[in-house]
Design a protein with these regions (language model features):
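Short hydrophobic segments within beta-strands
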Residues: 33-35, 86, 149
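Short glycine/serine/threonine-rich phosphate/pyrophosphate-binding segments
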Residues: 40, 65-68
């Protein structure tokens, strides 16, 4: 049985007790951008319930044009007002450089990716960079409540980056 088949069986059990549709806008008016790392259960880390927040994930939890697009939709069309950023210790994005990664892909495929992997060397600095990208974006109208954190994968604690 594949992992997907197991997840489909889990969904059958979930659907049996599903409470029904929730409103489209998040009830807490929050958008979270976090790393896709499987060790981060964003809902548990923040104590989020279903329907409370938009959770946007990518490699590193970095702010790219696509995250700006998602945040603009979240704020402009669905009423979110707060943004929470979550990076984490022991992140894979700390283990390589963009140039090395792109070079390896080019060596393998013959094509150098046009996109940036957005690897970084310093967690706190990258959180600050992500906040700065949001603040600089004309597409994000609500910028009063943007906070960034580093999740410690050993202790389970969030540490705010200032």
């Amino acid at each position: 049985m594949s992992a997907t088949d197991e997840y489909l069986a889990n969904n059958e059990r979930y659907a049996e007790t599903f409470a029904g549709p929730l409103p489209l806008p998040p009830s807490r008016h929050v958008a979270v951008v976090a790393c896709m790392d499987a060790r981060l259960n964003v809902y548990a880390i923040l104590g989020l319930g279903e329907g409370e927040a938009h959770v946007i994930r990518n490699a590193g939890g970095v702010i790219t044009d696509d995250e700006i697009r998602s945040l603009a939709i979240s704020q402009r069309l669905l009423g979110t007002r707060e943004i929470i950023l979550i990076h984490h210790t022991d992140c894979g994005m700390l283990t390589f450089t963009d140039d090395d990664f792109k070079g390896a892909i080019q060596d393998e495929t013959g094509i150098k990716p046009a996109w940036s992997a957005e690897a970084f060397r310093d967690l706190d600095e990258d959180v600050r960079q992500s906040v700065a990208r949001i603040l600089a974006s004309p597409f994000i109208p609500h910028k009063d409540e943007i906070r960034g954190f580093v999740f410690d994968v050993i202790t389970g604690k969030l540490n705010e980056v200032s």
